[in-house]
């Protein structure tokens, strides 16, 4: 395909929406304002696509996610733009690839106000807009030039502490998502359509270690991905993660019940997904499947035929155009995403649009995890069953530097959230039989990685240097560069420093005394000296723990 701009090669899908109208389904563009649907966008934090009961995961129960999927459409191939919270969410809100958003391309940075977001557009067209939990985050809203979170007006005042019944004490976010949603609904005027963003903090780390076992889960039911060592501690850690997914599902159920009680369920376009993959080594903050492949279920009363599975490759940049089209609002030309209405309005399962066989993902700076906060830029193209990853700076550590001092949390490899599974993989460094797990997660990678997704579901067999796949690699790389160039990737313009110079507002480890950037900047010299000493003490504590982990592995 010589021209792979998604805006160009996906325009043909609009004709499929017309076909849906001919079959008796109302096209969103023909809607009158008074018939505009409500929009409920539910997004979890760090949930990989395979972990739901409808996908066959025996160790987790997600009846409410399954309910949405069965009532509507399950998307088998949905991808985030970036496997990192803030840039993934920015791409959803703006309908653009993260690399198009300048400072919005990174974690703990900014999201410039010049970029339009769909909640603001809908609000201008009469929608009641708000969010609870985690909206666009983490980053600095004020320095972005915004007066509020781009997800809408905040509804986080109502708190809850029912966790003891769930088996934890204080590891979960204490916002009552459903109660705040109800408060949001009470604020709207009459039958005003609403657009609400429900962002759960779960299943983001940290977890209450052993939660899954305390809830009666059996470690034997866990399917340990091949890129992780199969140890009791890893199995227990995965159970804890799955338990938090169940907590998310419970909150989803409460919100669905609220809609049903108010008679709004059938007039609400409901989307359930996650921002990026599970917080484990070689998953989150990576462009492999477990980092970018997301759960996605969408239902909309009787407007769409339910019980279907769609194979089209879709990207999070497609959400904003979908919501705007559903509301009968013109989609801004600068949005790179394409509406999912043809897929939703179709009566069929499987591949709806044959041209939706390609998608793109990226990574820039995730955590402060290399000297000076340097990024580990990556770009990828998934086309049909092949995934090509381009590591633009292969000399840099892909998961953060191995030296703890250079990382935000003063642990090695700071792009990987710390927890039991990370410690288990760190311990593999000195075990000859298990060293592969360490290398897969942390070691430097070649410039190109090529994987056959169907034959290699965990992306462990790099085909990039295999002569048999040379033409495949070259074709994919050509398509990738064409798309990056057409969509204004600053790396293709020699301006990658824009992504790297953005302030990192979280702690920069020793550089900010273990404090968040603005907090550190407000200290006097004496206070900074104390912060530096506290950070050095924390570093020593981490180094001692790291020594214990590695020594135990050597024995």
Regions found by a protein language model. Name each.
Residues 493-506:
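Short, charged, surface-exposed hinge/linker loops at domain edges
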Residues 2-449, 457-478, 482, 492, ...:
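Formylglycine-dependent sulfatase
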């Amino acid at each position: 395909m010589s021209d792979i701009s998604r805006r160009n090669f996906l325009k043909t899908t609009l004709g499929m929406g017309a076909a849906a109208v001919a079959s008796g389904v109302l096209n969103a563009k023909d809607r009158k304002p008074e018939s505009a649907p409500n929009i409920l966008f539910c997004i979890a934090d760090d949930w990989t696509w395979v972990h739901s009961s409808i996908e066959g995961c025996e160790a987790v129960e997600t009846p409410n996610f399954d309910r949405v999927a069965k009532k509507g459409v399950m998307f088998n191939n949905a991808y985030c733009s970036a496997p990192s919270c803030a840039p993934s969410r920015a791409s959803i809100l703006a309908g653009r690839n993260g690399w198009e958003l300048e400072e919005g391309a990174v974690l703990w940075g900014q999201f410039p106000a010049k970029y339009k977001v769909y909640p603001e557009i809908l609000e201008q067209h009469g929608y009641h807009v708000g969010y609870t939990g985690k909206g666009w985050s983490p980053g600095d809203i004020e320095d972005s030039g915004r007066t509020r979170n781009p997800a809408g007006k905040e509804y986080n005042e109502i708190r809850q502490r029912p966790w003891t019944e769930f088996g934890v004490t204080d590891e979960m976010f204490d916002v009552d998502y459903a109660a705040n949603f109800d408060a949001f609904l009470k604020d709207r005027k009459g039958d005003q359509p609403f657009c609400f963003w429900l962002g759960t903090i779960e299943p983001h780390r940290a977890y209450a270690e052993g939660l899954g076992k305390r809830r009666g889960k059996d470690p034997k039911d866990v399917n340990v991905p091949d890129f992780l060592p199969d140890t009791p501690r890893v199995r227990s850690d995965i159970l804890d993660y799955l338990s938090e997914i169940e907590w998310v599902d419970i909150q989803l159920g409460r919100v669905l019940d609220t809609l049903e009680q108010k008679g709004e369920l059938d007039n609400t376009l409901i989307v359930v997904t996650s921002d990026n993959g599970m917080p484990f080594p070689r998953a989150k903050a990576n462009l492999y499947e477990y980092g970018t492949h997301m759960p996605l279920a969408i239902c909309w009363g009787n407007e769409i035929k339910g019980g279907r599975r769609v194979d089209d490759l879709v990207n999070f940049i497609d959400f904003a155009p979908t919501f705007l089209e559903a509301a009968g609002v013109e989609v801004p030309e600068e949005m790179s995403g394409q509406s999912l209405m043809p897929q939703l309005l179709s009566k069929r399962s499987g591949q709806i649009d044959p041209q939706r066989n390609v998608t793109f993902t990226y990574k820039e700076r995730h955590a402060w995890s290399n000297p000076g906060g340097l990024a580990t830029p990556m770009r990828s193209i998934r086309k049909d069953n092949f995934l090509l990853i381009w590591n633009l700076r292969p000399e840099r550590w892909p998961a953060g530097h191995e030296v703890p001092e250079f990382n935000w949390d003063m642990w090695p490899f700071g792009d990987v959230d710390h927890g039991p599974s990370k410690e288990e993989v760190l311990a593999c460094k000195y075990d000859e039989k298990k060293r592969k797990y360490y290398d897969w997660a942390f070691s430097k990678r070649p410039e190109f990685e090529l994987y056959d997704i169907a034959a290699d579901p965990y992306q462990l067999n790099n085909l990039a240097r295999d002569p048999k796949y040379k033409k495949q690699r070259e074709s994919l790389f050509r398509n990738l560069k064409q798309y990056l160039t057409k969509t204004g990737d600053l790396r293709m313009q020699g301006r990658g420093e824009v992504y790297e110079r953005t302030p990192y507002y979280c702690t920069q480890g020793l550089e900010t005394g273990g404090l968040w950037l603005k907090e550190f900047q407000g200290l006097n010299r004496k206070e900074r000296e104390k912060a530096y000493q506290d950070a050095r003490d924390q570093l020593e504590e981490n180094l001692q723990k790291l020594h214990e982990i590695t020594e135990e592995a050597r024995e």
